[in-house]
A protein has these predicted regions:
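Membrane-integral, polyisoprenol-dependent glycosyltransferases
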Residues: 2-4, 8-408, 424-432, 500-501, ...
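Membrane-embedded architecture of ER/inner-membrane glycosylation machinery
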Residues: 16-39, 213, 326-619
Length: 619
């Protein structure tokens, strides 16, 4: 019986009677046997939406690689993987190739901020597909797909009925879509950690040692992705679960010697080797980039304590309303179970392993959020491990509510949220486009007709979800919501290409605006037409993402005037001349001081990012 039926008030949706018998049969037998055609259809739905959300617009074959690397981390990590590949290919002995895979290098200098798992995976993908920004993102995409697939299989095995909802909600939430397309280490840790924790719970429920391999193997991968935070979080979640259930013996049973040997056999070789080759590794990695990053604001990522509440709400879009209700439901059910266990009138055997899944998911969801809320450095990717359990809770909650119906206000709130998200996406080009477009003319104002069209589309999204859910049942809510997301992604990335089918060029406007506004790739293409790859490129007052982006796309470190001085030879200079809302940064007067009378002339302009490109003569 759905907990929400006892806790919520208000009129509920009419439920198809067949769903009630379906749900009762599911909970009675613990497994659901669907006809083969139904299983094939379910798998087809799962694969279509999952592949679309993870792949479309990422590669040149499906939707086009519409967005270059963004932020400072993506081009930096991609460049490290590229340099590792160069060192690997240039080595002629087994020892040399192994050493090339140990120490990450950035512009020829050791970069010891993160372990090497992402660099290894990106390096070999570069070897197979070439050095591209989209191939630099494939490590995250592939791990996300494996994680979502195993969520589907795990739920189908241990929580049948809600498995497709859980998998699709995971695949179709903003946090997973975004980080699965990132050339970063966040998904490299979150996905293996999620798989490992699901494996541990499978062991807890079945008592089969086979599943214990999961927690040790995948936690080992997560450790090689981000370091000791992975086993720390896994241990903290399991210990908290044992404490809540008062089953302390499971901690001793979890300490399984074959698993421990497997974990250290995976992790220790790289950590020992990198410490041997780089004596400063322990200080730089463990002390500076782990302890100091948590305890101080040295890296200037300070945010308020409640920051991650906002991040989680945005990461779960468009499922945030349902996710919040599911999380509250899970907390209430966990409290009820805890009180039942403490009650002196509790019947023997009332607390069975199957009853513990919501408690496990709630702890898994909340512990990373609470833990990193105390960190002095806060970045959105830190709480990515909390997204899968919240999505699973949401999928399981929706399935359990099929028999009792979903509160109308919750459904309406979910639909309205999807409408608001639709409106925000449709207005996105207006928010990010500069006040002056590339030809020097002012950007046209938003017309009344365009605004009415956007409002109509948003209202259409709301009505689509309401009508489909009311007409075909709660089981179709996932399809209606995912269909809205598909339409929004087509609006952002445009239509095509699909392998040999060419794209519809008129639909690519939005992604081109985003690419020119946030990525250095179009600017690097412009510079490539102005100067050969061997010519020096310098930057002045630009953001770090521009600096690292130009370095990756040119495969050569750019010179920063403020850090390295002015090169003596002739070079191209990229300087930021305007700030937000077109504010003048008085860059020209500052350049006069740096160049000290040297001749320079403007050769290109990049208004989307407030940049100018100059040709600076030799000294």
């Amino acid at each position: 019986m759905c907990i929400g039926r006892r806790l919520l008030t208000g009129e509920r949706l009419k439920v198809d009677p067949s769903l009630e018998s379906y749900s009762r049969e599911a909970h009675k037998n613990g497994r659901i046997r669907l006809p083969r055609w139904a299983v094939a259809g379910e798998v087809a739905i799962f694969l279509f939406f999952t592949v679309f959300f993870l792949i479309y617009g990422l590669t040149p074959y499906v939707g086009g690689d519409g967005m270059g690397l963004v932020g400072a981390d993506e081009p930096r990590y991609a460049q490290i993987a590229h340099e590792m590949l160069v060192r690997f290919d240039s080595a002629h002995t087994i020892k040399g190739r192994l050493e090339a895979c140990v120490t990450p290098y950035l512009y020829g200098h050791p970069w010891l901020e993160k372990p090497a798992l992402y660099y290894w995976r990106a390096m070999f993908l570069f070897k197979d597909f070439g050095v591209h920004d989209w191939s630099a993102r494939l490590p995250s995409t592939t791990f996300a797909f494996i994680m979502i697939g195993l969520i589907y299989l795990h739920m189908r095995r241990f929580r049948p009925g809600g498995h497709l909802d859980a998998a699709l909600i995971t695949a179709a939430c903003a946090g997973i879509i975004g980080f699965s397309r990132g050339a970063s280490t966040d998904m490299q840790m979150a996905a293996p950690l999620a798989i490992g924790l699901l494996g541990w719970y499978a062991w807890y429920e079945t008592n089969s040692k086979f599943w214990l391999y999961d927690i040790y193997f995948f936690t080992g991968l997560a450790t090689l992705a981000k370091g000791p935070v992975a086993p720390f979080l896994a241990a903290l979640i399991i210990v908290a679960f044992a404490a809540l259930r008062r089953e302390w013996r499971i901690l001793l049973r979890t300490l399984w010697w074959p698993g421990i040997v497997l974990y250290f056999a995976m992790v220790l070789p790289w950590f020992i080797a990198v410490q041997h080759l780089n004596p400063t590794f322990f200080r730089e990695f463990f002390l500076e980039h782990n302890l100091e990053r948590f305890a101080t604001d040295r890296y200037q990522h300070q945010q308020p304590f409640w920051y991650y509440l906002v991040v989680v709400a945005l990461a779960m879009m468009p499922w945030s309303v349902l996710a919040a209700r599911a999380l509250i439901d899970g907390i209430q059910k966990s409290i009820a179970e805890w009180r039942l266990r403490r009650s002196c009138n509790a019947r023997p055997g009332a607390s069975q392993p199957g009853d513990a899944f919501p408690e496990f998911l709630v702890l898994w969801a909340l512990i990373p959020i609470v833990f990193f809320s105390f960190s002095q450095s806060k970045l959105p990717g830190y709480i990515l491990p909390s997204i899968p359990p919240i999505a699973i809770l949401t999928g399981d909650y929706l399935f359990r509510c099929r028999s009792s119906g979903l509160n109308r206000w919750i459904l309406l709130s979910h639909s309205v949220l999807c409408g608001i998200m639709t409106m925000a996406v449709l207005l996105l080009p207006r928010f990010v486009a500069p006040p002056i477009v590339s030809n020097g003319a002012a950007a046209p104002p938003l017309s009344a007709h365009a605004l009415i069209a956007d409002l109509g589309a948003s209202l259409g999204a709301v009505l689509l979800i309401l009508l489909i859910t009311r007409g075909f049942g709660l089981a179709r809510l996932r399809l209606a919501t995912c269909s809205v997301l598909v339409a929004l992604m087509l609006f952002i990335y445009g239509i095509g290409p699909i392998f040999s089918i060419p794209p519809v060029s008129a639909t690519k406007r939005v992604i081109h605006i985003l690419d020119r506004t946030y990525s250095a790739r179009p600017l690097a293409d412009l510079i490539a037409g102005l100067a050969p790859a061997s010519e020096t490129v310098a930057v002045f007052r630009v953001r770090r993402d521009v600096e690292f982006g130009l370095s990756f796309y040119r495969n050569r470190e750019v010179v920063n005037y403020e850090e390295n001085g002015v090169p003596a030879e002739q070079h191209l200079l990229v300087a930021r001349v305007t700030g937000r809302r077109g504010a003048d940064l008085h860059t020209a007067s500052a350049l006069e001081e740096y160049l000290d009378g040297r001749h320079y002339e403007r050769v290109a302009s990049w208004p989307e990012q407030g940049l100018e490109v100059y040709l600076v003569g030799s000294r």
